[in-house]
Amino acid sequence: MRYNLSNICDYVKGKIDVAVLDEDKYISTENMMSNKGGITRAASLPTVIQTQAFLPGDVLVSNIRPYFKKIWFAEFDGGCSNDVLVFRARDGINKRFLYYVLADDAFFEYSMATSKGTKMPRGDKAVIMKYEVPDFTYEEQEKIAGVLEALDKKIQLNAEINNNLAA
């Protein structure tokens, strides 16, 4: 059986004062890395008073040009640009499992196919929540997320080793 994304998560709507943020705690589309590469330090903070808030365990996805596949599993609390979608897993949904559902290339392809605009396509927030996801028990979600997280850690370790060899 399959569900819509809206059955397993919600968009976060909370705000945070920019005054309590620094460049390490602010995420925008500019400091999200392409191809699921995580984040870097922001170059600057926005000039607005408040921005969208996120918490550890939330999943942040750039909503501009989805083909860049910019996604990050939040490891700390902070604030982000309005061009970044913040997803929060509902009760009974494993947070890492949600991350891997959204990190799947099929999600980015769906987001592009249903996006609006040509030069700077944006995902349609209402349609994104209709993305179909498989129905797994919490225990199955934990197992799937555990295997994928172990693979991600191995890939990251191999990349660090390669960088050290190149240096």
What are these regions, as identified by a protein language model?
Residues 13-15, 67, 116-117:
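Short beta-turn/strand-loop junction motif enriched in small, turn-promoting residues
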Residues 4-56:
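Sequence-specific dsDNA recognition surfaces
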Residues 1, 25, 78, 100, ...:
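Residues that recognize and position ribonucleotide moieties
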Residues 79-83, 116-145:
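A short glycine-rich beta-alpha junction/loop motif
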Residues 50-52, 56-108, 112:
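A short beta-sheet element
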Residues 29, 89, 133:
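Active-site donor-binding loop signature of nucleotide-sugar glycosyltransferases
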Residues 1-16, 32, 130, 134, ...:
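Non-catalytic DNA-recognition/assembly elements of restriction-modification systems
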